[in-house]
Amino acid sequence: MDSIQQRRGGIVSLSPAQTPRSSDKSARESRSSESNSTNRNDKEKGVNVQVILRCRPLSEDEARIHTPVVISCNENRREVAATQSIAGKHIDRHFAFDKVFGPASQQKDLYDQAICPIVFEVLEGYNCTIFAYGQTGTGKTYTMEGGARKKNGEFPSDAGVIPRAVKQIFDILEAQGAEYSMKVTFLELYNEEISDLLAPEETIKFVDEKSKKSIALMEDGKGSVFVRGLEEEIVSTANEIYKILEKGSAKRRTAETLLNKQSSRSHSIFSITIHIKENTPEGEEMIKCGKLNLVDLAGSENISRSGAREGRAREAGEINKSLLTLGRVINALVEHSGHIPYRDSKLTRLLRESLGGKTKTCVIATISPSIHCLEETLSTLDYAHRAKNIKNKPEINQKMMKSAVMKDLYSEIDRLKQEVYAAREKNGIYIPKDRYIQEEAEKKAMAEKIERLELQSESKDKRVVDLQELYNSQQILTAELSEKLEKTEKKLEETEHSLFDLEEKYRQANATIKEKEFVISNLLKSEKSLVERAFQLRTELESASSDVSNLFSKIERKDKIEDGNRFLIQKFQSQLTQQLELLHKTVASSVTQQEVQLKHMEEDMESFVSTKSEATEELRDRLSKLKRVYGSGIEALDNIAVKLDGNSQSTFSSLNSEVSKHSHELENVFKGFASEADMLLQDLQSSLNKQEEKLITFAQQQRKAHSRAVDTARSVSKVTVEFFKTLDTHATKLTGIVEEAQTVNHKKLSEFENKFEECAANEERQLLEKVAELLANSNARKKNLVQMAVHDLRESASTRTTTLQHEMSTMQDSTSSIKAEWSIHMEKTESSHHEDTSAVESGKKAMQEVLLNCLEKTEMSAHQWRKAQESLVSLERNNVASVDSIVRGGMDANENLRSQFSTAVSSSLDVFDAANSSLLTSIDHSLQLDNDACTKVNSMIIPCCEDLIELKSDHNHKIIEITENAGKCLLDEYVVDEPSCSTPKKRPIDIPSIESIEELRTPASEELLRAFRDEKLSKQANGDAKQQQQQQQQHLIRASSLYEAAVSDSRYPLSAVN
């Protein structure tokens, strides 16, 4: 009792991985989850229902009789083609689905490609539904449940969607290491009654099964549907679910039909609810809920083909009714109807959320490839193809906090405790009185039944002993008779062979006679039918001939009336011709008048054109004068531009001469510097030569005693030579710098000349458009150009000056370094040769004199370089002043030319304004002439319009007169043929159809013989030979009628026979 209460009420310990609830609480929570869901995924709104099609292979019986296949599946293109024969033509209908699986597909292929993603979405928190739909015997239950489990517990290869989904769910949850709880429900819908397949088996069965109350289907206020009192099994492993599934499937109602040996007679819904615990970043524990509904629908069936009778027929009717309601719901959803008939069936109420609701739905449509099931297959394909267009709006279920779940569970436990206390108040299990009486009666009946079965068992045991003894005696007798039987069989075979030959000959002769009689009877019957039909046709021909004579008389009367009408029409034609000629004359006179007026208008237009040409000539003369005035102004501007060009060229030439003069003066200055430097070097060389002679003499005197002094003197001589070589290289560098500066100046002057010429050319081109503005811009550009050139010259001069200063400083540094080296050398010589002081003093004095002479020469060269620098600076200042004076003179000349140009422009503008005013007066005069010409033309057009109006009125009167004459002739005088009532009325003629004529023809003899032989074989199979001989004539007549109905389409036409 406690285990039953634990399963029903869900009273278990509240571990983190298990949060079970009772059935009522589950329904309330599911409704709350649907109404309060806030975690919506915008991408999943408006998702179409996924439709998968699966075609089963041919059964063994179908393959044995070679049943034609009318369904072809293209899995790559996801398309199904159904071959249908209409009016003798084969027509293929194509249907496209989300996934297509042909007869060769396996359970694993279907699950991996179509169902596996749906299971992942369930674990993400969605509600998903998978249901199989199709005709009975097409494999719905096999697809959903698969084959039976193996005894060793291995997972079967042909497992269906439900066991594979369960296995995948547990594998994923175990791999993630998640804390979860799972519960399942399994219900059955049979004859519109819901029963729980997981309800516990009670020890006492109900006497009448109909007295068992079905489970109630309830709705909340928000449109959701839930089943009250449904059992929920809490599971923790996949094997538990497999056992529950086997137990529930065993309780389902199944029966054998002609189409399926084990056909499901009810709909089943297997639901799996999963609660998964998650931890938020804030550390709170949340419960995520997902639900998977796996629906196995009962198949629609044709009662005539399934062989259902009585109770089974009622079951089939209820199944077809619920599936028909499902089809109506699908049609209404696809057509967006205002009313969806969910409440017409409990099946559609249960699937309400799956069709157009918040659930992700997958439909597996199963079909048969056999031609015998083509009608049901096409119906399934149409409904499945329509279901593709249903749009659901799936939403993720709201995550619940663990504390809220535990609070609800505690309140549920308190409620169940109160119910248990109320039930056990009276020291035992309390049950109703009626139930107790019923159970006692059933116990008594059960005891009586057990006694009766025991008696039957004893009697059957005695009978078994007797039968065993009889069996032993029969075995001995069988062994004796078997030998006799073998001998008798050999004789029998010989006799049978001879008898078979005689019977075969007799049968052939008798069959030939009967066949001839059958053919003759059919020929006589056809002859009689032909004679009767010929008499009928003769009667129809006589009545038709009388009708033809009456028609000829009517045609003669109509000819007379037509002759009178033809004369009347000719008379009307002559009158109409006369009136049209009169109308033509009137129109011709009006046209001549208009031609005269047009001639007058033409003359006026010619005078207008001559006046207009004179005014045009006058305008042309004025324009030529204006052109001459404009040309004179342009010539004046050209003269000013020429003067400006001359002034610019003179300015540039003076500037060029000044620059060349500056370069010549600079060259002369550097030549003077070079000559002075050469003289200085020559003096130094001569002094050095003298010093060398003195040193040689001194060395010869002191060679023996002072060899080290000679070496030192040689080193001094080397240093001095190097110094003068350095001085020579610096002088060479100075000469190169001067030449480089000269070339740079020439290059910049040439660039300045090119820029000046380009600027002058541009100004000359632009002076004609914007003279005043461009003159100011020209002066500014020229001033900038000259300033830039002067600036460049200054920079080059300053650069050269700095270069010269650098060379001078380098020379001074080298001189000072040599001086320092010399002093060091003297100190060393003085310290090392102290003992030779007397001899060295004379040489020292001479060397001091030479050194002083060298210092004087050095100071003199430094003075010369300073003078050169000062002269360069003064030359630069003079050059800048001269260039500034030249530029100022050019700017003053350009200013004078600009004033002259502005006066010339103003005078040209005055002349142009005067010419423009005179041109405007001439244009006004021309416009006045145009207005005068328009008034004259209007004065001519007005009388023309009046004449046209008068002509229009006369033309209308003539037309009215012609219309009256036509009506009088064609309506009053025209004779109409009156009916004489002698014309034969239309009556239906009994024309024999081609089918009736074909029915009169006797079938071919081969066909008659074939039908006769078939009828004879069927009668022989029934073993009624005597009755066949007595009723031979009746059988022949029946075989003839059957033959005519069978071969009516293949008869020859009667014309071909004749």
From Swiss-Prot:
One of its GO terms (cellular component) is spindle microtubule. Keywords: ATP-binding, Coiled coil, Cytoplasm, Cytoskeleton, Microtubule, Motor protein, Nucleotide-binding. One of its GO terms (biological process) is mitotic spindle assembly. InterPro entries: KIF11-like (IPR047149), KIF11-like_kin_motor_dom (IPR047241), Kinesin_motor_CS (IPR019821), Kinesin_motor_dom (IPR001752), Kinesin_motor_dom_sf (IPR036961), P-loop_NTPase (IPR027417). It is found in: Cytoplasm, Cytoskeleton; Cytoplasm, Cytoskeleton, Spindle. ATP binds at residues 134-141. Residues 438-517 form a coiled coil. PROSITE patterns: KINESIN_MOTOR_1, KINESIN_MOTOR_2. PANTHER family: KINESIN-LIKE PROTEIN KIF11, KINESIN-LIKE PROTEIN KIN-5D. Belongs to the TRAFAC class myosin-kinesin ATPase superfamily. Kinesin family. KIN-5/BimC subfamily. This is Kinesin-like protein KIN-5D. It comes from Arabidopsis thaliana. The gene is KIN5D.
